[in-house]
Design a protein with these regions (language model features):
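All-alpha RGS (Regulator of G-protein Signaling) helical domain and cognate RGS-like helical scaffolds
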Residues: 1-187
Length: 187
């Protein structure tokens, strides 16, 4: 008997073996899901640090509105992730904070130097750096979602699947919006 595990939207399904199928029926959450949620909380926290700079570094209304949207959605998602971890009796990891594994930064995370450059920039230079860095940051979140869904058994519960899918959709929309803003400012 072939057992087919559906892929995330836009990704192919895959055939899984009997052991994987049995394991999937017994899962409440996976280590990959816990790592994803813990890492995404840290990732979102850096995005909040970036959006906080908008109030003093730009006068563009569209940048302010973008920042407010990102700020609101990321704060709501951080709260949702805290609750997800708490319901499972899992704490936020202190290990690695900005690092995923092997001492490497999580995908899309800004380095201390990039954050310094952003914090010191003003006006149109700030706007450009903010958009470039936030696009990079959002692309990193997409990589994290892809890695979650590539992990065996991860993303199978409806709550984590819905959350990760929403992160994917929101980040893609915001990347499109920011890319258009960046292109518009270059004209």
């Amino acid at each position: 008997v072939r057992i087919v595990q559906p892929g995330v939207p836009g990704k192919p399904s895959r055939v899984i073996g009997p052991k994987e199928a049995v394991d999937l029926t017994q899962l409440q959450y996976t280590e990959a899901e816990v790592r994803f949620v813990q890492a995404m909380m840290t990732h979102h926290t850096q995005a909040l640090e970036m959006t906080a700079l908008l109030t003093v570094r730009t006068s563009r209304e569209d940048m302010q509105l973008l920042g407010k949207r990102i700020d609101l959605s990321q704060r709501d998602e951080i709260q949702l992730m805290r609750e997800w971890l708490a319901l499972r009796g899992v704490t936020l990891s202190n290990r690695g904070e900005l690092h995923a594994h092997d001492g490497m930064l999580m995908p899309g995370m800004l380095t201390a130097e990039e954050m310094r450059r952003l914090a010191e920039a003003q006006g149109s230079e700030f706007d450009r750096l903010f958009l470039e860095f936030m696009i990079k940051h959002h692309e990193g979140a997409l990589i994290m979602v892809d890695e979650l869904f590539a992990s065996v058994g991860a993303g199978q519960q409806s709550d984590i699947f819905a959350f990760a899918s929403e992160v994917d959709t929101d980040q893609r929309m915001e990347i499109g919006r920011m890319s258009a803003m960046l292109e518009g400012s270059r004209r």
